[in-house]
Amino acid sequence: MNSLKNHFLISVPHLKDPFFEKSVVYLCEHDKKGAMGLIINKAIKKNNITLKDSNSDIELNKYLEENYLHIGGPVLTDRVLFLHTNNDISKSVPVSDEVSISGNIELLSSIQKSKDVKSKLFLGHAGWDSGQLEREIENGDWLIQKSSTSIIFEQEIDNIWIITTNSLGIEIGDISNTSGYS
């Protein structure tokens, strides 16, 4: 299977895992070793979080005054990551020509001050071991779509799952609630 980096994984209705039910995952990495992504359409209802580094708390809580904190996934749920536009920011890793990822909280201050940079903050991430994601896709658990920065950064999180399924030309009610092959 070709790399699905910079693609969306869209969960199908039968996927009832609490993290992934009606989720859209942005894949930041996918290779023969496995895959890593961030759920872009679920927020945590929390105003303040505390990290081990107290200086990071200040930057993080300033950011959270104006932005959501998203559930990135069930892996390393005490770790903060963020996606942002503008690949010219140091200490970030490009995912595509338009999107980068970072775990460096100190960057939040400069990102928040820039009117040209859009961002999303996540707690935790989704991860798959070698071959695991491919098996889930073959099993019919995920739909695949090329990513869109407007969906990642501009859409209301409650609408993202429906928008992505509709953009595939799929009526979600037409998808079976059981997995496997037809």
Q: Across the structure, where does each feature detected by a protein language model lie?
A:
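A short aromatic-anchored loop/beta-hairpin motif
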Residues: 1-122, 126-182
